């Protein structure tokens, strides 16, 4: 991938960086509305003097490789639509924590906190972290497995729904 625009779209912010000639640019953060998503990408691409042929979008939501329906916004990101409207060779969509899993090997060891010392029997990894929701991804036998685990109803939430208490200020679920 020669030149690419990299996007991380969360429930609150959009972050972007450019990958130009094997160099990652400074990451910028901004708040945008759903309706401004494609115009914002178009503006970013037009501001660059280099030709940008690739777009990588990481977003919170189920990814079928063609589109992502965000779990925390009223937005569906469609790869083919972005390729056409932004005149791109390729748009790659990733679940947000799938993107984190891809970046894991780029992090320095000092970025990690060891909770319990031990001798791992393999390199399988479970990644969990907060964002707009709870992000979860797995790496099993060097294969990245994105999940929507953070969007699964807990038994407590289900019980509150069943008893019609989910809207009550007296009860909440963690």
Place the predicted regions along the sequence by residue.
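Short, acidic Gly/Pro/Ser/Thr-rich loop/turn segments
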Residues: 14, 62-64, 133-137
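Short beta-strand-loop/turn "lid" adjacent to the catalytic site in phosphate-handling enzymes
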Residues: 49-93, 98, 102-110, 127
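Two-metal-ion RNase H-like nuclease active-site motif
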Residues: 2-8, 125-130
